[in-house]
Amino acid sequence: MLYLVPTPVGNLDDMTFRAIDTLNICDVVLTEDTRTSGKLLKHFNIDKPMWAFHAFNEHKALKSIIDHLHQGKNIALISDAGTPGISDPGFLLVRACVDEGIKISCLPGPTAFVPALVASGMTTDKFFFEGFLPHKKGRQTRLKFLADMPATIILYESPHRLVKCLEEIRDFIGET
């Protein structure tokens, strides 16, 4: 079975008991970055093999992981912070598991955008999660599309591009 296990976003005390128990029963933990995940696993005394699984190797690693799942291995997928598959690796693996009839268990847990949305004071009854905007090609087209969205828009952006992104959004949407 594939387990999608959310990890804390900034505070290790947010790790759930169920997430710890799940990681302990798995044969292997797929990690976005073994250094970051190694610290997390060590903190909770979880001694499991870690396999790197990230945007640069997920296509190549997919077949081997699916083979191990078909052999009955329990495999957990974690990201550096938050829920795997939300602007992190995981979609291709989940899709392959669905296509192959492999059971998936997705644990509830942290995502960065939910607390940010709730604490923003913006309307939460309708929102659109865009994730990361394209870096170059298609960025302006995407912003134009989002400008007409009748909902709160949620974007992810890296700290070093944040000011530029906010300026671009202001140019398309205006100051509201």
Where are these regions (language model features)?
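Glycine-rich, flexible N-terminal cofactor/catalytic loop recognition
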Residues: M1-F56
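Beta-strand/loop-alpha-helix module characteristic of Rossmann-like adenine-cofactor folds
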Residues: T111-T176
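Loop/turn-to-beta-strand initiation segments
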Residues: M1-L2, G72-A76, T152
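Short glycine-cluster motifs
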Residues: Q71-F129
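Short glycine-rich anion-binding loops that position phosphate/pyrophosphate groups of nucleotides
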Residues: V9-L12, D80-P84, P159-R161
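Short active-site oxyanion
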Residues: L23-V29, I102-I104, T152-I153
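Conserved helicase motor
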Residues: W51-H59, E130-K136
